[in-house]
Amino acid sequence: MRIGRRTFIAGASATLGLVFAKPAFAREKIKIRDLYKTQAEFSDQAKSFAASREVINVPGFMAPPLKADASFFVLTQRPMAVCPFCETSADWPSDIVFVRTSKIVDAVAFNRPIMTTGILELGEAKDEETGFVSLVRLVDAQFEIL
C-alpha cells in the first residue's frame, strides 16, 4: 500500500501537533522568585496570571503554621521564624506567598517541597479572618507534597 504525499504530510502534521500540544489539564507554573520584576514591581508573567484568574501551580515550602486549625499557610523558599505580614505590607518579603485554602491545613515539615495550586492575586490586601496584610496571595488553593 502506497501513501500519497498529501496523506503523509497530513498525518505527520497531526502527529507533531499531538507531540507538542500541551495537555488540557496542565497548569501554568511560576516560581516564587519570578513573581517580581523588581523588589517593588510585579513581573509581567505574574500580572498576566492574576488578570486571567486561571489556576496556576507554585512550588515551594510550607512555613511553620502561625496558628492551629487554620485554613491558610505561608508558601516560601526558606523557613521563616516570624510572621512576615502581621503588621504592614512594607515588611512583605519578596519570597513568600499567602495561601488561602477551603479547609483546615495539615502542617507539612518545613523541609518537604510542596506544589501549591490556586488563583493568583496581587496587590495589598488585608485578610478579613486573620487581619494579615499581604501583597501576593493564592486563593481557592490546594497543595500536595512532592
Predicted regions and their residues:
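N-terminal export signals
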Residues: 1-3, 7-26
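OB-fold and OB-like single-stranded nucleic-acid-recognition modules
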Residues: 25-146
